[in-house]
From Swiss-Prot:
Protein name, UniProt field: Phospholipid phosphatase 3
Gene Ontology molecular function terms on file: ceramide-1-phosphate phosphatase activity; delta-catenin binding; integrin binding; lipid phosphatase activity; phosphatidate phosphatase activity; sphingosine-1-phosphate phosphatase activity
Site description Stabilizes the active site histidine for nucleophilic attack, residues in chain: 256
Family (UniProt): Belongs to the PA-phosphatase related phosphoesterase family.
Signal peptide location: none
Classification of source organism: Eukaryota, Metazoa, Chordata, Craniata, Vertebrata
Pfam family of the protein (one): PAP2
Annotated metabolic or biological route of this protein: Lipid metabolism; phospholipid metabolism
Stretches assigned to the Extracellular side: 55-85, 145-194, 245-258
Description of the deletion phenotype: The homozygous knockout of Plpp3 is embryonic lethal. It is characterized by a delay in development, absence of chorioallantoic fusion at the 6 somite stage, allantois compaction, impaired remodeling of the primary capillary plexus of the yolk sac and gastrulation defects with low penetrance. Persistence of open neural tube is also frequently observed. Conditional knockout of Plpp3 in the cerebellum is associated with defects in postnatal cerebellum development, modifications in the cytoarchitecture and arrangement of Bergmann glia with a mild non-progressive motor coordination defect.
Motif (Integrin-binding motif): 183-185
Catalytic-site annotation from UniProt: 200, 252
């Protein structure tokens, strides 16, 4: 009768007599975690650095000339804005972060999904990753926008109203006018040179499209099939309305808004698919190696098997 022996894979013991998983130094793990958080914050700061420098310094946009008969820059200056900067930032950031907080809470505590992080609280780890990716995308989008504004210096539709050049000193027969002096307030004149591309369009498209993709990945409830598409449609319409309002307010040309939409959508897709883990395949927990079965033959069986081979 044959007997079998099963060999099990044994975890190598550490110097302290236990397994490595049980002998990790908590202080070492905590310091490593703090170091990684500091590295993330440094990357976030570097992504936002161009935006911070341009907004807080006296960097002036490129000084572009104009044509006297250019009707696209002769619109009046509207004092009030349909959607000002404060409303744009508040709505875009608050809605996105609230949606992420709710979505990650539902995923961790209701769906019981696990996090790969070593943090004891998986909800905090998931929230840190998703909010961090969103803010990183915001920083990149705004830095791209401000770099384009100061580098290109396209004139806004209300430029001549703000600049108020002295046409008595300008010879319009020369065609493209480069030598001119603005009599308007300098800060408003410099702002009127930042038409391309629309910051409202790029920021609103990034935040809303990021939320659309977040809902696509996290909103898994199948009770109402049209609820998720309705929410996604609403978010995109909010972004489109924000961009189109800039044309109605004479702040941007239509091409500025289209370029802003394209930039915001591109950054949102890159952040979602290449930085975050929203659409990455979930890996199952690794199973232990199967037991190895070894056949042990008795002396009689060995003799019989040898005789069989000799006869062959």
């Amino acid at each position: 009768m044959q007997s079998y022996k099963y060999d099990k894979a044994i975890v190598p013991e550490s110097k302290n007599g236990g397994s490595p998983a049980l002998n990790n130094n908590p202080r070492k793990g905590g310091s490593k975690r703090v170091l990684l958080i500091c590295l993330d914050l440094f990357c976030l700061f570097m992504a936002a650095l161009p935006f911070l420098i341009i907004e807080t310094s006296t960097i002036k946009p490129y000084r572009r000339g104009f044509y006297c008969n250019d009707e696209s820059i002769k619109y009046p200056l509207k004092v009030s804005e349909t959607i000002n900067d404060a409303v744009l930032c508040a709505v875009g950031i608050v809605i996105a972060i609230l949606a992420i907080i709710t979505g990650e809470f539902y995923r961790i505590y209701y769906l019981k999904e696990k996090s790969r992080s070593t943090t004891q609280n998986p909800y905090v780890a998931a929230l840190y990753k998703q909010v961090g990716c969103f803010l990183f995308g915001c920083a990149i989008s705004q830095s791209f926008t401000d770099i384009a504004k100061v580098s290109i210096g396209r004139l806004r539709p209300h430029f001549l109203s703000v600049c108020d050049p002295d046409f008595s000193q300008i010879n319009c027969s020369e065609g493209y006018i480069q030598n001119y002096r603005c009599r308007g307030e300098d800060s408003k004149v410099q702002e009127a040179r930042k038409s391309f591309f629309s910051g409202h369009a790029s920021f609103s498209m990034f935040t809303m499209l990021y939320l659309v993709l977040y809902l696509q990945a996290r909103f898994t409830w199948r009770g109402a099939r049209l609820l998720r598409p309705l929410l996604q449609f609403t978010l995109l319409m909010m972004a489109f309305y924000t961009g189109l309002s800039r044309v109605s307010d004479y702040k941007h040309h239509p091409s500025d808004v289209l370029a802003g939409f394209a930039q915001g959508a591109l950054v949102a897709c890159c952040i979602v698919f290449f930085v975050s883990d929203l659409f990455k395949t979930k890996t199952s927990l690794s199973l232990p190696a199967p037991a190895i079965r070894r056949e042990i033959l008795s002396p009689v069986d060995i003799i019989d098997r040898n005789n069989h081979h000799n006869m062959v």
